[in-house]
Amino acid sequence: MQTIRILPNIRALLRDGRESEAIDVINAHVDVVAPHIKDDLRYIKSSDPKTSLCLSKIYFVLEDYQQAIEYALRAGDLLVDDGSFYYTSIVYHMMDSADIGGDDRIRDFVLKVIGAEDVDDSLIGYLFSIKAYGLLKEALVKYISDGNDCRRLLDLLISLGEEEGCLKEIYGMLAEIGPGKKPFIFYVIDAYFYLEDVEKVKALIERLVKEDILLCYDVAFYTEDNYSPEIEVADQRVMSILSGEFKKKILGAFLLEKNLTSFKFLESIARTRTHYLGLANSLMNLGTSNDTLYRNNADIFGQSSEWAKFSEVASIGMIHLFNSNPYEILKNYLPSEVSQKEGGALMALGLIKAGTFSEEDTEYLLYFLDTEDTLTPELAYGVCLGLGLINMGSANREILNKLKELSKVDRTLLVEASVYGMGMLGLNSWSVELLEDLRTIAGETEFERVKRAVGISFSLVLMFSEEMFYDECNASNGDFKNYINELLYDKDSIMRANGVLSLGSAFVGTGRLGVISTLLPYINDGDDDVKRAAVIAIGLVCCDDRDLLVGTLEPLSENHNFFVRAAVAVVLGLFLSGTGDKVCTNILEALMYDTNSLVRQSACIGVGFITMQCNPELVPNYKRIIEKLNRLIVDKKESGAVELGAVLGRGLSEGGGRNIVFSVRNMSGITSADRIAGAVLFLHYWYWHPLISMVSLCALPTTVFCFNEDLEEEEIEIPTSSRYNNLLICLPDIKKARRFKQKPKEDKEIVIESPSVLTFGSRCTIKQREECGIDAPAILFVKKKK
């Protein structure tokens, strides 16, 4: 009340031209008098900093923030941090204005203010939002030099950079900062490759050879694991890592030596006379190089014919995944000039040599494409898939032209085979030309198989293409949007399913809620193929976020449509392989008792994935689940579909001698295109069973190694809990023994205790890594102990 009484004095001072005195009085009581003197502001003529600051405060109280900011800027050096509510608020309003863009004076003031602040996540986020890359670069350097873990922050910046179409600027900034310590140096390597500056990677590796050989090994391993570059350096130790020979050698030896596969258990499966014994054997011995069962039971496997035999021979490639001499292994199956033999052997060759870009192997496979007259469907598939696997993601124009020629023949299966090969070659290439070729093939055929293969290839080519949807400077981004939109609204249900799958592939691992909301309505599409594709696509988008994946798909596990329930089961299992996730194991166990055979099959496969390297201590219902799978294998009353699911699920649960999981992340923990391709192809096994072997592209050995400067074995000891025992639950008896025959007792459960200390080459499960704090890739390079 006392303050209100001074209003007449303020007005009198203003009207008498005594502005300075009036401003002093207003400043002392601005919060109260401001609403009452807004009509008297016209008497203020001065524009000096003191008056401007007072006017800013008045307009701030009046909530005219635009005017408040304008006068605050005119106040110049008088606008200082006095701890007042006004100062804090006006700065926040300026930050909002700078974020929107416009007045450079606001931006300069904000940058001046925040330049004096301590660097934290929120400051870096704000600098990114206003595109202040210069200050952002300085802030990042300080943030990292303070010893902060930058991984989560940089991952977020890169994700936002993709979404806002400024990824080039983000990576350019990281490249300018240059390599430092781990883990920042790996982001700089990503930047060099994104900017297509491989020479800088080579120069960095050559410098580290002289300065820090242990860090050099880390960099070389990361580079090979993620980019498989054609970099040559003089140091043979580093070169062995860059070529991939080092990784293949240590992983192959690990899987061979630590193989826990029980051949008695495999023999018990053989006694059930299942048609899928070869599949179970290949999964259980994946990467171990142990094909004893094949060699000892050649008569059983020799009875298969046509596509069944193709699948069995192709799956040999899974067993010898890390073998360095595939021609010796496959010599009895590989075709030659005088004998067509097995096309599956060519696919096996591709699985073993996947991603090597071997010219010798490519030339060998291309020979068969020149024999079109004698080219059988089995051989064509072997050639095309083999070429696609070996040259995956290379976009080799010569090979693509050969496959394009094959796609023009009037033989449906050969066209389908060529399309698969084209998609694998174009993996993650974002090639508009290749997309046009595939669209032409789809438009010229009426066969569902070919159209479906085109859709899978579309999804492979568009993989990880999210940034192209936001990059307005790139002319191709409109093409991508048009391709997918045309497919999403196509009258042909298969093409619609192809569009759904391609959208999920383009945004793989991003967790974009907008994309998920676009995909969810297709769950209610009138066609089952579209429903299934929608679930797979949602799984792809969410595959890097467990909570989002489970939260989105869990409600769909109770969907009225059995195709949706079936797809949910496989997708949850594959993307959470080896985690023993309790929520998902409960979902999948319930689906094992579904009324529909396809759902039960898919649930069996899903639990096979999710229970890998688990036991009853990690998963409470583990025994009940595995015993159910075992009963389904021996129960002859079950349908063939459920039998396939049970055998496949059991093979997966014992996969790789219990030393692997299946993951879309590589050893460095990065979601990689080739592994996503393996997942996409495997998830379409329902349409063509030989695609089951593609799951081997996702195989991830789980171990821990330690090497010194000479790449020699270095002993380590990492304490771990005793919760990771291996439990093998055997199959129940197929039939009861006669009373007068004494049947020898056999243990139905075999336990192999896990060590309490992890040493060099020990199995180290996903859960153990989390428990022991071991970062990917679990290959340590340390100084030699004296």
UniProtKB/Swiss-Prot annotation:
GO biological process per UniProt: proteasome-mediated ubiquitin-dependent protein catabolic process; regulation of protein catabolic process
UniProt similarity note: Belongs to the proteasome subunit S1 family.
Position of the signal peptide: none
PC repeats: 311-343, 344-377, 382-416, 417-451, 498-532, 533-566, 567-601
CC annotations in GO: nucleus; proteasome regulatory particle, base subcomplex; proteasome storage granule
Gene: RPN2
MF (Gene Ontology): enzyme regulator activity
InterPro entries listed in its UniProt record: 26S_Psome_Rpn2 (IPR016642), ARM-like (IPR011989), ARM-type_fold (IPR016024)
Subcellular compartments: Cytoplasm; Nucleus
Record protein name field: 26S proteasome regulatory subunit RPN2
Taxon lineage: Eukaryota, Fungi, Fungi incertae sedis, Microsporidia, Unikaryonidae
Function field: Acts as a regulatory subunit of the 26S proteasome which degrades poly-ubiquitinated proteins in the cytoplasm and in the nucleus. It is essential for the regulated turnover of proteins and for the removal of misfolded proteins. The proteasome is a multicatalytic proteinase complex that is characterized by its ability to cleave peptides with Arg, Phe, Tyr, Leu, and Glu adjacent to the leaving group at neutral or slightly basic pH.
SUPFAM superfamilies hit by this protein: ARM repeat (SSF48371)
